Amino acid sequence: MGPGQPASTCVHLAPRTQLDGRSDPKVLQTQNQLQFNRNVPTHSSNLAIRYSCPHAIRIEKLKHSYNESYHCKDADCRVGPDLGSSVSFSVISQERLSYAVHLARRDVKRRQFEKHIKEHHLRSQPQSSQKCGHTKYKIPDHRVERKESKSQAACQCSHQPSKVEISSSGAKVYLYSSHPGQSDLTVPNSPPTHDPGLQPHPRIGDHKNISEQKSLLEVQRLQKELSSCIHKIEEVTKKDRLEEALDPDEERRIRIRRQEQAARSARMLYVLQQQVKEIQEELDKLSPHKIKHTKKSWAMSKLAAAHRGAIRALQMFVTQFTDRGEHPLPARCKELGSLIRQLSLCSVKLDADPSVPDVVIDILQQIEALESLLEKKLSPKKVKKCFSEIRSRFPIGSQKALERWPSTSPKGERRPLTAKDTFPQETSRPSVAKQLLADKYQPDTELPETQRLQSELDVLDADIVLEEGPFILDQSASFKDEVLAVAKTKAGKKKPVTENVPFRKKDTLAPARQQGLRKAERGRQSQPHSKSRVQQTTVSSRLKMNRQPVKDRKAPWIPPNPTSPPASPKCAAWLKVKTSPRDATKEPLQQEDPQEESHLTGAVEHEAARLAWLDAETSKRLKELEELKAKEIDSMQKQRLDWLDAETSRRTKELNELKAEEMYRLQQLSVSATHLADKVEEAVLDRLKPLLVKAQRVNSTTEANIHLKDGSSVNTAKAQPAQEVAAVDFESNNIRQLDDFLEDCASELWAVTHAKILGSETLATVEDSKDSPDLEIMMRRMEEMEKYQESVRQRYNKIAYADPRLWMQEENNDQKISAISEKPLSPHPIRITKTVDRKDPAVNIMLERPCNGNSLDESVGTEEGSEKREAPLLSLAEDSQQKEGRAPLFVPPGMQHSIGDYCSRFEQYLRIISHEAVGSFNPWLIAESFSEELVDEALGAVAAELQDMCEDYAEAVFTSEFLEAAT
């Protein structure tokens, strides 16, 4: 890979022996290893990788003569002393050598044929037509001279000695240097790596739009890739692959590589599917009658990109197939075939080139052949038979489309040529070159096209029969049928033109023969000479057979495809042209076989019917899928609506049940609270009556003693001082005893009252810890109900699917936080203290009950007081008789007044906490009516809000579940 010499890394086996004839054990270990040449200089250019266009065939001569080896030794070409015993040459099969000789002979005969055509054209052209038809023949003469100069230059270049180089192994290498004028024949598929400079613009009469050419080129590339894919699969299935025992690491690597290949192929198929879908949508949007140029070019560029993606997917598929062998392939090959079918149909809809339908038909046939071949790949004996049957079923377009393909791929030239994959594929390509040469230099008015083609093929193939017979005996029939079919269709569309009519580029319509062949010429003008191979041997003999005259001429049948665009105005004009007398005279001269015509027509009709059936079946399946989709969406919407109705009814029923339970609970609470208050009041009064009786008795006893003392004090005012001291002591003792008794009584009364109150509260808490017979408690309960309603509303609005356990935990936490009861507090106990000793013990006691403004009913209080005053007087003697041995207490008037005041206030407190009905004032009726109104209003508002919320929730769920999913 040096700058001035080619890469010459010699790889060979180098066994060595010792002098005694025995093998060296160290050498035996490495004799089967590859020995690389280390004489290559360590230059930076040798480490770089260079890519270039494929070179010509490189042939190295064998070193069998002593002179050559001696010459090489003198020229210092031999690198090492051990290279004399090694034999270094390029191994070329006999088939490739014979094929190269055949191509050289064909090129020589082609040049002879061009000279013959030119001489015949110059002799047959009269002087008058040279003056009148100068414009007509000006361009062909220029082309002839240009081609002649190119052919002469090619001959001179071919006769010049090739460049001789000597490799490091000592062998002579003849390198072929191509002529610079022929560089325009090859158009590689790779993008340009440099600026090509100014290119001559193609003429409008000779070339179509660039986008159409690119689309046609991509379709033909896909066709060629399909054919190569089929050949490779055939080769793989024909070989008997033996399963070798692999290491676990190797098996793991193979498995990982296959998984990566499967993932990559899946991504490629997905991208290709999306591209096909976008192209189909764009084609559906485009009108078949009026299509803007920008939209059409955009669609064609996308179609070409999709074709390139399909080619890459095919190459990956073939790689996986050859890697896996007999392992089962995934089902993506069928999907790839369907995508290629859709791409082909899109190409037919979009392209106006008449050669596209033929290529598409061949692609569809190849896809069917590929699928059937993959289905039977496990039985290699049946593969060849199946494929031959499929090719016999579809004889139209297979070879014809292959011969339209210009071989421009560098990979195809680098691939080694063998008889299996070269000859059957390349045998039908020379027909294009023959037609082009015949139509360029032959006047339109000499002979009918069929006879002209026969004569040209006779001249060209007369000398090739003996040379190429063993290669192509089985390919002549299909070639002959296709050549005649092309001649018939183009002779039928041909418009009569005289010699004197000048040729115009844009204004007039050229003959159908020239324009039809120019369309084919654009797809074939870049075909290299190394790929245009003539291998049909029996064509001339078969074309010389007598043909029956054609009685009627039929226009080619157009398949009734509703989705394909209508024919162009030029094609429509050609179809409507009436037959002229000149055409009538030419009809008896055109000869063809009725059986072959019927066979071709039947095959074309069969293929057109199959395409129409495929379109109808595709539209039918799409319609069925749309109907199924609509039905499924309707059923899903119906199910969702039914579920929403059922859920709404269930929620409403639950709310009604909760409302009824709450009302019943409130009623029970009101009844139980009333009974509880009555019981507490009765129990408190039962415990307080004995204490009140005792207090009244003590009061009455004290008053009697005071009266007696006053009377005795008047009579005995001048008694002894010792008696006064005894009386004072006795009075102080009585006061002390009374204070102790009152303290004990007050403490017992306070304990009993609090025990009753706490017992009532405990009982109410046991029944319902949250409910009490107070109005504020009911208001608090209503607030709790509103909070619960708000939580329900938030739950419906948020649509949060939380855990029910979390809800229960939150409710338990709320229940633990009990509301602070604002009950009226009980009065503090009376603290009775001793009064200050007064000097004058005489006190006027007023036995009257003081008026209390806070009392609810004074009349009731006075009546109760009179009853309490009268009762102790009656039972005072009985109590004194029953309780003998106890000292009576004498209470002063102030203390008695305080005791009475305390009793009245205590009764008022009991009346407040018991909610006793006093006159027309009944607090329980008011509280019950107020609570019922509040509950009714709250429940009505909650029900209305819940109804609105359920409707909003249903609408939101329907929108999110169905409308968004449908769009």
Curated annotation (Swiss-Prot):
| InterPro entries for this protein | MNR
Instruction: Supply the source organism for this entry.
Output: Homo sapiens (Human)
Is-annotated flag, keyword Coiled coil? Answer: yes
Task: State the oligomer form and interacting partners.
Answer: Interacts with CEP63. Interacts with WDR62. Forms a complex with OFD1 and CEP20/FOR20. Interacts with PCM1.
Q: Which disease is it linked to?
A: Orofaciodigital syndrome 15: A form of orofaciodigital syndrome, a group of heterogeneous disorders characterized by malformations of the oral cavity, face and digits, and associated phenotypic abnormalities that lead to the delineation of various subtypes. OFD15 features include facial dysmorphism, lobulated tongue, clefting of the alveolar ridges, left hand postaxial polydactyly, broad right hallux and left hallux duplication, and intermittent respiratory difficulty. Brain anomalies include vermis hypoplasia with molar tooth sign, agenesis of corpus callosum, and ventricular dilation.
Cite the entry's keywords alphabetically: 2Fe-2S, Ciliopathy, Coiled coil, Cytoplasm, Cytoskeleton, Disease variant, Iron, Iron-sulfur, Joubert syndrome, Metal-binding, Phosphoprotein
Protein name listed in UniProt = Protein moonraker
Q: Residues annotated as region Disordered? A: 178-201, 401-431, 490-601, 849-872
Spell out the GO cellular component terms annotated for this protein, sorted alphabetically and separated by semicolons: centriolar satellite; centriole; centrosome; ciliary basal body; cilium; cytosol; endoplasmic reticulum; microtubule organizing center
Region Necessary and sufficient for CEP20-binding, annotated ranges:
885-967
Presence of keyword Cell inner membrane: no
* Secretion signal span: none
Described function:
Involved in centriole duplication. Positively regulates CEP63 centrosomal localization. Required for WDR62 centrosomal localization and promotes the centrosomal localization of CDK2. May play a role in cilium assembly.
Q: Which gene encodes it?
A: KIAA0753
Comp. bias regions, Pro residues = 557-568
User: Which regions are flagged for Polar residues bias?
Assistant: 179-188, 525-543
Q: Which residues carry this modification: Phosphoserine?
A: S287, S409, S700, S826
GO annotation terms (biological process): centriole replication; cilium assembly; cytosolic ciliogenesis; protein localization to centrosome
Q: Which domain of life is it from?
A: Eukaryota
